[in-house]
Amino acid sequence: MRRYSRVVTPPEKYTLGHHASVLKAHTWRTVANSAQYLAPRLAPGISLLDIGCGPGTITVEFADRLAPGRVVGMDSAPEVIEIASRFERPNLDFLVGDVYALPFDDDMFDIVHAHQILQHVAHPVAALKEMRRVAKPGGIVAARDVDYGGIIWFPPISGLDDWRDIYKRVHRGNGGEPDAGRRLKTWALQAGFENVATSASMWNFSNAADREWWGSMWEERVLHSAFAGDALDQGAATQQQLEAISRAWREWADSEAGWLGMPHGEIIATA
């Protein structure tokens, strides 16, 4: 496994940052729970670029499934690439890079993949154009993003309504689009793709273990992650509001009736 560094242009601000409560969720991600829509396209020998790979848990699965095909994981955060680099595979590389200026020649990869990335960039169409550039003719660009406006939960807890409203305000204040899932198709069309297959899937948290895992993460995130600081700095929330939201997540996690669904839009666009 080799690691490379490239000059990275200053990125849009990542709303959640890389607090331990955020990386806890990122290391949970797998092909099964986050890229199942792409699974039928994965075959040995295929090359793949994983943009915004984070700590690399999905990327290393790609490397195992596609071997001996080359897999490259890329992220704009050097500290996250350091974490991902613990995965050692002969066909796997990690690098620090910029989605707007990918350090590859044209027509390099069979698949260019981005999970939960386009929601965080100010220019998703430009990012998709650059992803298309490095995809081989007939290859695919695959993307999956959550849609915060579509998240539903039970029981009704007013603090969670406040959470979503404040989160969306902060996310947009940082240059992103929290309702990206519903926009993936139109962004791909604007990027020049003509053949865009769409699908949708949902993360669901309901049993006691899942509620505790998800609820405790947000209970902590709203007080200690980059989101908390930005909410205060942007005037989107007061400290008292954030503390109330943290308690709301604890209330939801402790409720036997607790249920939450997070919808995701998905696209497979042919280059």
Label the predicted regions:
Residues 10-14, 20, 197-260:
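C-terminal helical/coil "lid" or tail adjacent to the Rossmann-like core of SAM-dependent
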Residues 27-44, 61:
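Conserved alpha-helix/loop element of class I SAM-dependent methyltransferases that forms part
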Residues 49-51, 55-101, 126:
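Class I SAM-dependent methyltransferase SAM/SAH-binding core
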Residues 100-111:
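A short acidic, Gly/Pro-enriched loop at the edge of an enzyme's catalytic core
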Residues 110-124:
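A short SAM/SAH-binding and catalytic strip from SAM-dependent methyltransferases
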Residues 125-140:
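A short glycine-rich, Lys/Arg-flanked "PGG" loop and its adjoining helix->strand segment in the class I
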Residues 142-211:
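Conserved catalytic/acceptor-binding region of the Class I
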Residues 191-194, 262-271:
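Core SAM-dependent methyltransferase catalytic element
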